[in-house]
Amino acid sequence: MTVVPRKGAVGIGTLIVFIAMVLVAAVAAAVLINTSGYLQQKASGTGRETTQEVASGIKVDRVVGYAPDITGDITRLAVYISPNAGSSGIDLNKVRVILSNGQKEVSLKYNYVYNATSSTQTYVALPQGNIFNDIVLGVNGTSENAASTQVNFNWSLLTGSTFGLIVLQDADGSVKASTPTLNQGDLVIIAIDVDAALGGIPPRTSITGEVIPEQGAPGVIEFTTPSTYTAHVMELQ
């Protein structure tokens, strides 16, 4: 009986299995490398977004109210805002202000209005004198069309769902009338007609609210008005 040698066949089979294992390992390694790279990029992107979300936002520095008659209600509100430290530019066109007196809650947005007849608008830079005057003297200091045109702020152009902007500090000219962007170092007043929005704010009234940017932490509004009004202009927060 003739015996056929099988050692060569076994050796070739083992080599084929080994090569197959190497190829599978190489493919698996490539998949792992690609996956880890993708996950690393996603993690980096998420980290940047989280950092921006935490660092960005609006800070409410103070809130001042105005009562034309000290025996009546507060009719106008000035909310002083600035960006949080490390915040990127904030588009004030996308900002919403929420106000509540416990019985009514309103949402307000910036609406740039220009009245050609009276040369007044809902925006002014470098205000002169009392910011609560019916007409606030100032300039269109960051206008795209005129660097220092005399254009005044008109409180009567505000409604119960809109607010205006009074720019106090804006070194880089980013807070423009139609495209206002709040950057580091800027200080802006959000002007609110609370008579139109909430029907006025009487004494002993608790007001809560937020200044909500498109991205980042909101600024908090929270105060209680005095039991009696002894001055026309009063600091509330």
Curated annotation (Swiss-Prot):
GO terms for molecular function: structural molecule activity. Pfam families: Arch_flagellin. The keyword Transcription does not apply. Keywords: Archaeal flagellum. It is found in: Archaeal flagellum. InterPro entries: Flagellin/pilin_N_arc (IPR013373), Flagellin_arc (IPR002774). GO terms for biological process: archaeal or bacterial-type flagellum-dependent cell motility. GO terms for cellular component: archaeal-type flagellum. It comes from the Archaea. PANTHER family: FLAGELLIN B1. Belongs to the archaeal flagellin family. Flagellin is the subunit protein which polymerizes to form the filaments of archaeal flagella. This is Probable flagellin PH0546. It comes from Pyrococcus horikoshii (strain ATCC 700860 / DSM 12428 / JCM 9974 / NBRC 100139 / OT-3).
